[in-house]
């Protein structure tokens, strides 16, 4: 199984290398970029909810779920997204492909562990602004990733607690080039920010039987506000342009800024749901993010930008016709659906940037073990055309593999 896992990771990494920015959203222009979904395809296909956990799947959104893990589990996931962007006067389209997560969970008894890599934010935009006097071009790339170590402890059959220790790292580059009409030379400004530092996320997973058929699921997670280190540099250059549009640097100057801090906002999530083992589940969650405490300066300075506290509302679930059917493969398939609404906290020209998504997915049994492939689709909308802003309509196709095995087995010899 390990060899299969390595081959799969290599293939997905090769595919994802075609577009590692992970986004083409103009809204990634602001702050440290667009926040990436931090969860598995299984989570995403149910509106992003984090409360459901079992013994054979990793739940990257709730460290408390690791206490229920019974098998060593590898999971890897990637996605392809098509986006249509429009304003009141124009429209464009874009596509991105990315590797979304890579993780392993290791059960050792009541105390279980996990380790993995997942994107935190992504920057990827290209904006052209032309008028009678100037021609401006804004481009950006990069983002922040996190390596995480998770520990989850099963207190009893009902309660499990856990913590994520995340090391965040990455860099963001924002470029601005301007050329004035009738002037031979132009100017370019490159702002690069390197980011690194730790943050924590605590999770509680509580499940209890209500009767012989129904089970109650509840979840609570909390990530406290923590600071990470930033190092910023600026390159200012005078340019000339060849006939093919390429740049020639005439003169340039590097400016270094003092080391600073970025406050990652606190986040709290509460959720509850009900279901029947191996049959169906439905749940709802609410998250509150203190984005108004955000204090990052990337070199992009706009008076009409501010951050408000963010909220997320999620609803989702799954249905399995007959999980142990011997005659029908599709009766053993897990059918998932969900929806979400997010107030992102980003406020431009007094317009809050909101996001909506509706998702569907399937979990496909593969082989004799608990190994499964997961497919998910999401259609969503971000932003608005009000106040001269941009509305994005996106379609996302996600795929993941979850491979299970049993390690640390004491072998018996005759």
Language model regions located:
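Positively charged n-region of N-terminal signal peptides that target proteins for export
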Residues: 1-5, 208
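Sec-dependent N-terminal signal peptides
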Residues: 7-9
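N-terminal signal peptide c-region/cleavage motif recognized by signal peptidases
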Residues: 13-16
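Subset of outer-membrane beta-barrel
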Residues: 20-414
């Amino acid at each position: 199984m390990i060899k299969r896992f390595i081959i799969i990771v290599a293939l997905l990494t090769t595919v994802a290398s075609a577009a590692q920015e992970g986004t083409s959203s103009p809204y990634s222009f602001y702050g440290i970029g667009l926040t990436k979904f931090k969860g598995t395809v299984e989570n995403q296909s149910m509106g992003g909810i984090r409360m459901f956990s079992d013994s054979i799947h990793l739940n990257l959104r709730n460290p408390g779920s690791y206490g229920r893990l019974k098998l060593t589990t590898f999971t890897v996931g990637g996605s392809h997204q098509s986006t249509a962007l429009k304003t009141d006067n124009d429209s464009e389209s874009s596509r991105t492909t990315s590797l979304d997560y890579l993780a392993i969970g290791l059960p050792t008894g009541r105390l279980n562990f996990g380790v993995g890599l997942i994107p935190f934010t992504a920057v990827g935009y290209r904006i052209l602004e032309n008028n009678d006097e100037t021609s401006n071009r804004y481009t950006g790339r990069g983002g922040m990733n996190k390596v995480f170590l998770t520990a989850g402890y099963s207190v009893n059959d009902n309660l499990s607690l856990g913590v994520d220790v995340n090391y965040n790292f990455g860099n963001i580059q924002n470029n601005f080039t301007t050329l004035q009409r009738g002037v031979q030379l132009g100017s370019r400004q490159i702002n690069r920010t390197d980011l690194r530092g730790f943050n924590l996320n605590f999770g509680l997973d509580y499940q209890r039987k209500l009767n012989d058929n129904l089970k109650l699921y509840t979840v609570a997670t909390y990530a406290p506000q923590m600071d990470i280190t930033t190092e910023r540099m600026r390159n200012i250059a005078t340019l000339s342009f060849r006939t093919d549009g390429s740049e020639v640097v005439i003169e340039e100057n590097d400016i270094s800024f003092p080391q600073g801090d970025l406050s990652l906002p606190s986040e709290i999530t509460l959720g509850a749901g009900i279901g029947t083992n191996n049959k169906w589940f439905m749940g709802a969650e609410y998250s509150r993010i203190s984005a108004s405490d955000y204090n990052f300066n990337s070199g992009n300075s706009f008076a009409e930008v501010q951050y408000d506290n963010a909220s997320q509302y999620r609803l989702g679930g799954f249905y399995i016709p007959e999980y142990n059917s011997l005659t029908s493969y599709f009766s053993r398939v897990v059918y998932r659906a969900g929806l979400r609404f997010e107030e992102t906290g980003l406020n431009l020209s007094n317009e809050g940037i909101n996001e909506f998504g509706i998702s569907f997915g399937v979990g496909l049994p593969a082989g004799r073990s608990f190994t499964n492939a997961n497919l998910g689709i999401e259609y969503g909308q971000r932003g608005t055309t009000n106040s001269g802003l941009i509305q994005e309509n996106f379609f996302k196709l996600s795929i993941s593999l979850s491979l299970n095995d049993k390690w640390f087995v004491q072998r018996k010899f005759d």
